[in-house]
Design a protein with these regions (language model features):
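Active-site neighborhoods and metal-handling regions in enzymes and metal-associated proteins
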Residues: 1-388
Length: 388
């Protein structure tokens, strides 16, 4: 069965582009780290997503590359990684901190020297700086005490922010599946079910229709928990009159888009309808600003002003959009301090969230920037008040 995915040739091109940027910044080697929960940067280069353990990708300025994993992931990584040089390293072991006394492991010295990088006074860039643990950084400094170690996240953002045709195809396939899950949950919603039961409906739908995993922990929240910007579903029983927030997602070859919308369990009360309508209006305002060449901070500042002009400053939490791709929330965000211009084939979640004292809501969809505006990656969001 054919499936939507990133071809092996694209992984090779990614490493080549990375090497070009490394040379511009005089880097001898780049170490790109990730975890099970935030795997995006190393998976971008090798296609491997760890569990329990961590993962690192080492790329030398000469183009050679290797994958570093915990001792239990060597065979797993060897089977799925597009980079076939696999090194077991204790820096990447699981949090239980086993010592694995019977297993021969490698150090950063072993890996970097095998890639052809000689000497101790080298310049090392770190990609996935926030995902780099103290254990990883301490190990690198111990192996290379004379090295200059710098944050190289700017390289990762530059590489990942403009999407290829294959990446956009993966994102759109994820949206197709997430839409099916959304429709199935809406069909199943009724007074008396729990939030977690509805998560089960969504999970069944995404796996039956081709997802490798959920793109984010499925959001099915009701009433007070809808005021949480991020949260987890619970055993709460959904009742008539509730507002229910859905944010459902599907991962396709790592790419993890999400669809978010509120659902009324009956007609909204005047208070709820007022905030639901304002949030949708803010969402549509954002869409009108999106096109190549626009300064991201101008959109974010205008978005905040839209809240203030409508007397809604107290409901504002964060800016209007964030990047999406090989993880649901990725750089760049659109914030009042953002100094970049929108470019064609940037992909964003238009993520419009408002929070009140007793409830909140989110309208969220995915788009790709074009020269004259944007293309939607999913169906138009529906205004839903269920009838019971």
């Amino acid at each position: 069965m054919s499936r939507v995915c990133i071809p092996d040739s694209e992984y090779v091109e990614r490493r080549k582009k990375c090497v070009e940027m490394m040379k511009e910044q005089n880097l001898d080697v780049m170490i790109v780290n990730g975890t099970e929960s935030d795997y995006a940067n190393p998976r971008y280069f090798c296609g491997f997503w760890p569990l329990f353990e961590r993962v690192g990708v080492a790329i030398a300025a000469n183009g050679n590359a290797a994958v570093m994993v915990g001792p239990e992931s060597v065979i797993f990584a060897g089977d799925v990684s597009r980079i076939k040089n696999i090194y077991p390293c204790l820096y990447y072991r699981e949090g239980a901190n086993p010592s694995y006394p019977e297993i021969k492991t490698n150090t950063y010295n072993d890996v970097i020297e095998d890639l052809g990088v000689k000497g101790k006074k080298i310049r090392i860039g770190i990609g996935g700086y926030m995902e780099t643990t103290v254990v990883m950084m301490d190990g690198l400094k111990e192996c290379y005490p004379e090295a200059e170690i710098v944050n190289a996240d700017n390289i990762m953002v530059s590489l990942r922010q403009i999407k290829s045709a294959n990446e956009i195809a993966c994102i759109r396939e994820g949206f197709r599946i997430a839409q099916i899950a959304t429709d199935e949950v809406i069909k199943a919603l009724r007074p008396g079910v729990t939030e977690l039961q509805m998560v089960g409906v969504a999970q069944k739908a995404i796996y039956e229709n081709g997802a490798e995993y959920e793109g984010l922990p499925m959001y099915v929240f009701s009433e007070k928990s809808t005021s949480h910007a991020i949260s987890r579903p619970s055993y709460r029983v959904i009742e008539k009159g509730d507002i229910v927030q859905l944010n459902l997602s599907a991962k396709v070859d790592g790419y993890s888009p999400a669809i978010g919308l509120p659902v009324g369990m009956g007609k909204y009360s005047p208070e709820k309808k007022d905030l639901v309508d304002f949030c949708l209006e803010a969402h549509k305002w954002t869409e009108k600003q999106l096109k190549a060449g626009v300064l991201a901070s101008d959109i974010a500042k205008g978005f905040l002003k839209f809240f203030e002009d409508n007397g809604r400053r107290q409901n504002y939490v964060y800016g209007p959009c964030h990047g999406t791709g090989i993880i649901e929330v990725e750089a760049p965000w659109m914030e009042t301090t953002s100094d970049y211009l929108l470019q064609p084939n940037m992909t964003f979640q238009v993520d419009t969230f408002v929070s009140g004292p007793t409830f909140g809501l989110r309208w969220e969809k995915g788009i790709v920037i074009t020269e004259n505006g944007f293309e939607s990656n999913c169906d138009e969001l529906k205004y839903i008040e269920l009838d019971f």
